């Protein structure tokens, strides 16, 4: 029979050699001997013979232990030889032989190894018994050598992560995960239940994951945040621990604001999953020093709605001579409630209390406090009055159901002035989203560019931080099926939305916009004429020098067979050819 194939999983590197198993078997003998005192020799022989008759028992680690018991009970060697040889099917050796054959037929050794390992992994996952694993682990009394060897290999670490996810109460697996973490592989432990079983492991994974998010920056936040938030929101204990740690880090001058942003995104994730974490949020902030304000805030956050009674409590506190810290009301979930109350079409708000709502939102958005040694030394309210007026003006325009599109056009200059305030821009963006998402909105429009979409251009121009939300809304509208419109009307609408994306690109939000159009081209679910339209519009507004990232994204769109050669040149001016030539001569293009 062929020996082990190079690189296959059956070698001694994974499971040790026979002498090691023998020593372990001898070491475990005393326990069995003690428990087996007085056993009838015939019973022992019968038990051992039953084991010898099972398939491939000669390959089992306990073979030496069983042989010793059998011979001590007076067993016959002939029976052993006959049973072991008759039941030897050589599964492991056959795998190695097949692996050798595959390699000899030209298959890469690495590919053969992956095939064997993946099949073995699937079998282990299917047949794993946590009780047996725990019993074997308990009998060992120390960390088995084979386990330490296994965790040195990526394949088997991945197996342990999957098993730990499926069997969170298995002691052997939890211990193994800690071993993996101790060995410095905590960056791999992204599985929720695996990371959350032990505080020491969770702390390491939390630290590594948070560092990855902070180092990745805004552009990688969408990719890195969901797994992190899912892990933190695994349970109340993990949420409290993580938020408490981030609350402390958020106080640091360097990088503190970025950590606070991550903490707020996790709060939003918890809220979207239906968890009420408002009390933890308030307890970790400054609210604990203001129990009445804390009670009012907590009540509104828990209900997910503002109410006049609690708003009045906060209004009195924030119009007093010594108001609470503005940080108290700068809770994203709380500010979102103001968006719904003040900017959602058709929202009803008690007119007697409206000024209180507006004042608190304006206060949260505009007041600047100066602190030294944990003492507030000044409160800057220079922009409070103008912010309040802008919010009130736009609220009256947005929530007035009697104002149609034509009336809004007459108020555009006023809206543009008010949009310069960031909080108003956010409110207008929400209002536009709610309005244009109405099924019949575009059916009733006669203008080429509806006024609501024109407002998005102004928001893009004034507020760089709102670019992601603007693109998100445009993408949602672009991908929506407007079945109430005919085919030509749908194409015209999508061209209008592409115009907004091109404007967004011209305001500096380049890579996300081009990346989205590139995905549309690759998915083959967008009319190719729309891609050509986008390319033409972009070529009209760009000029060298270009960044390498932009070229790597945009050039493949132009070189696509459906695009190249289909965009008409204007006289002698051929922007597509000129752009491609410029890129070829100035960049090394990676396919």
Curated annotation (Swiss-Prot):
GO BP terms, alphabetized: negative regulation of transcription elongation by RNA polymerase II
Q: What cellular component GO annotations does this protein have?
A: NELF complex
Q: Which GO terms describe its molecular function?
A: RNA binding
What keyword terms does UniProt attach to this protein? Nucleus, Repressor, RNA-binding, Transcription, Transcription regulation
Classification via Pfam families? TH1
Under the heading PANTHER family, the entry gives: NEGATIVE ELONGATION FACTOR C_D, NEGATIVE ELONGATION FACTOR D
InterPro entries, A to Z? TH1
Q: Tell me the compartments it is located in.
A: Nucleus
Compositional bias (Acidic residues) spans?
A: 34-44
Q: What is its main location?
A: nucleus
Q: What is this protein called?
A: Negative elongation factor D
Query: What is the role of the protein in this entry?
Result: Essential component of the NELF complex, a complex that negatively regulates the elongation of transcription by RNA polymerase II. The NELF complex, which acts via an association with the DSIF complex and causes transcriptional pausing, is counteracted by the P-TEFb kinase complex.
Q: How does it assemble?
A: The NELF complex is composed of NELFA, NELFB, NELFCD and NELFE; NELFA and NELFCD form a stable subcomplex that binds primarily through NELFCD to the N-terminus of NELFB. Binds RNA which may help to stabilize the NELF complex on nucleic acid. In vitro, the NELFA:NELFCD subcomplex binds to ssDNA and ssRNA in a sequence- and structure-dependent manner. Interacts with ARAF1. Interacts with PCF11. Interacts with NELFB. Interacts with KAT8.
Question: In which family does this protein belong, per the annotation?
Answer: Belongs to the NELF-D family.
Give a yes or no for keyword Repressor in this entry. Answer: yes
